[in-house]
């Protein structure tokens, strides 16, 4: 499946380049595709279902998109961050450092295919420990794309994010909690 949106007057050329392997796809989905419309948590309350055409009330809370599917074990058709290429990659975590200000993840990516060059997107997620605050199973912390890698070639990417990005606001205590 290749999703092609409103590409403009040069879009056909770009699609042809991907289909003929002149350009190798490396994009990732920015949302989750459910197997069924009913798998989306707000599907029952959309106005065309409940008759309220003036207002929409979402009950998703913090569980929007992939956070809902991951946390409640709903198997999507295509996951957030899913993407295909004409080649394959091996991803190895080389180093992780963390202090009170930031987390840094260093990853080595190798094109293990034997025919096509390609780029890969490395995604870093974190999970909060169980606690009194409601939290999704995992959240995206950051991502990075490699340079164009020939078969057998390696690249090291570094994803850095603020430690405070993992905090949540606790309204009861009026404080940021990790």
Over which residues does each language-model region extend?
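Beta-strand elements of well-folded, non-transmembrane domains
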Residues: 109-113, 128-130, 163-165
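Short, hydrophobic/aromatic beta-strand segments
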Residues: 116-124, 136, 170-172
